[in-house]
C-alpha cells in the first residue's frame, strides 16, 4: 500500500491534507487555510486521527534528520492544534501516543532549540484533559530528560542558553506532574524513584545565586497563588523568566498536588538535598524559605506532618555537627508558627521530642566530649526558641499543658543535693519555661498557677543556682503581669509621683481573691527567702526582681505585702545574718520603694508622708547607698522637718542602718494607723515572720535559707503539697483592691457560740446618703470589743436569772419563725398561692388516666 502512495493522486486524502499544510518555500510558515481543512477533516473523521498523527511524526523525523527546522516546527504546530481541536475525540489516546513519540524524538536530538520546542509542545499536551485514560502510558523518559535539562550549565552544549534550558526542564517537570496527578491510573509519579529526580532538580534551581553573585535571597521571589497551570502557555509570562522564580512556583505546585500519603516521598528528598548541599549551615535562609513554601502549599491539617518529619530528621542527625543541628532547630522555630493548631494531635509528642533533644544536648555538653561548647549552647538556644514559637502557635490551654510538661522534666527539686549536670539542666529548662511563659496571657491566676505548678515554681525560686532563681522571678513577672506593667516595674526607682510610671491598675476579680487567700502565705515566704538568698555578685538584679514581683502583687494582697516589707526590714537589721552592708542597704531601699509605690496606689496621704519622711532622713544622714533622692528631681531633701540635733545624735560614720536609728526605719504602728484611717484592717500587720529555720545556725552563707520548711505563725495553718503551710483563709486580711477591705475575722469570737444573737446593724436607709455614711464608717475595734462584752454580759445574765421554759416562750412569742411546724405550714401556703397565680390563663392540666370517666354503654 505504501508503494502505491508514491504519487500524489494515489495518496489517501488525510496525507494529501497533511502535505498541503507545508509551504512550497522553505522560509514560509504553516499554511493556516489548509490547516483548517485538516482540522475539519480530523474532527469529521475521528478514525483517521491516529493515522494523521503517524504521518506527521514520520515527516517530522525525516525533516529532523535532514536538518529542516522550519518543517519540524510546522509539524509540531500542526500536532498542537490538532490536540486542542480534537480533545474530545475517541481516538485522542492513540493520537497522544504519536504526539509523545514526536516530543521524545525532539528531546533526543540534543539540540537546544528543538528541546525548547518539544517542551512547549509537551506543556500544551499536559493542559489537555483526556476523556478516556491511557493504560500503558509512561513518563519515565520525560522525567529523566527534563531533570537533566534542569542541571544544564555553560560548559555543556547549551552554552549561554543554559538558563533557557533549565527553564524548559522545569516547565517539562511541571507538565509531567500535572498530567500524572490528573490521571487516576498513573499515581506512580509519587514513587520515591521519581521524586528523587524531580525534587532535587527543583531545589537545584531554587538555590541558584543571583546575578550579583550573592547567595539565596527570598526577597527576589514573587508571591504566587495556588493555581497550577493556566489555560494558555503560562511559561511565557515575565515572572517565570528565571529558573529561580520558576522553580519556586514548581515546588509550591508540587506540594499543593501531594496527598497526605505522598508527603513523605516529597519531604525525604528535600531533607537529603539539604544535607548533601550543607544548606543547614546558619543562617539557613534557603532551608527556611523551602519549608515555609512547603507549609504554605500543603493542606493546613497536614502541616504537623512536616514538623514531625523535621524532628525525626533531627533525631537521625543527633551525632552531626552542631551547626547542622542549629540550622534544623532554626528552621523548626521559623515554620512552627505557620502550622498553627494543626499540630494539636501530636502536641505532647512534638514537645517531648524537643525537650529530649535539649536534655541530650545538655548531657553532651557536660560530658566533656563536646569540642565546641559555644556552638552547643547556640543549639540549645535554638531549641528553646523553637519551643517558644511552638507555644505561641497554640491556644492558651495547651500553653498551660506545655508549661506543666516542662516543669515535670525539671530534675531533683525535692532532693537536698543534686548533681552538677542536674543543676545545669534546671537552668536550661527554666529558660525554656520562661520562653513558653512569655507567650501566655494570664486571665485568672488559678488557671495557670495550679497547686503542683505553683509548688514547683516556689521551689525553683529557692534553689542553689542564682540564675535559676532569677529566671523563676521573671516567670512570676510574666504570668502575674496582665496589663503590661512589668516593663515599668522591673527597675523601679523611688518615684515622687507614681503616675509617671504609667501603670494600669484595676480591681481584683473574685477568682483571684480566692487564689491569693489560699496561697499568699507561700508566696510571701518565698519572697522573703529569695531576698535572703540574693547573690552578692549580682545583687541589684535579684533585689529588683523581688521588688517587681511584690509590685505586681500589690493590688491582690496589700496588707500581707506590708507585713512582708516590715519583715524584710527586720531581716536587714538582724545581726545574726552575715549580710554585707551593701546587701542590707539594698533591702532597705527595696522596702522604701515598695512602700512608696503602694502608698501612692492606695492614695493614702499620711502613709505617703511617712515614707517621704523616712527617705528624706536617710538622705540627710548621708549613709552610702541609702540616698534614694540622688536621682529624683525636686526632692524634698532640703525641706525636711527633722532637726539637726536629731541628726547628730547618732554616729556620722555608719555604713548602714541599725535598730537604734528609729528615725530611719518604718514603724509598724504608724503604718497601721495610716491604714486604719483609710478603712483597712491592719490586724495582721503586727504578726511577725518567724526567722528561725528549724533551729539552724545562720552562718552567713545563705544555705540555712535553702531546703527548709518554714514554720508559719498561723493558728489555722494547713499543709500544702510542697511542705509549705498556708495561712488560714479567715485569718488573712487580704485587700483585693485599693478600694475594698474584707470584713473583720470572726474566728475565736463569742459571736460564734450557740448563744450568739446575731444583731445586724439597724439601717434607717431612707436616703442614699445614709447608706453611704454607713458604708464609709470607720471600723473601731475598741468600740466593737466593748459592744461584744456588753452582749456577752446580757446573755450570761439572762441565762442565770431566767428559767429555760420562760426563755423558750419569750423567744417563740418574739419570733414566730422559730416554730418549725408553723414555718413549714407558712411555706406550703405561700407555695400554693404562687402555684395558683402561675396557672392563671394557662390551659387546664390533662387528667390522669384513672381520672377519666368512660361512657357507659347500654346493652
From Swiss-Prot:
A biological process term (GO) from this entry: protein localization to plasma membrane
Polar residues: compositionally biased ranges: 696-714
Cellular component annotations (GO), alphabetically ordered: plasma membrane
Superkingdom, natural source: Eukaryota
InterPro entries in alphabetical order: ARM-type_fold (IPR016024), EFR3-like_ARM (IPR049152), EFR3_Homologs (IPR051851)
Pfam families from the UniProt entry: EFR3_ARM
Annotated spans, Disordered: 696-728
Family that this chain belongs to: Belongs to the EFR3 family.
Protein name: Protein EFR3 homolog
Native organism: Caenorhabditis elegans
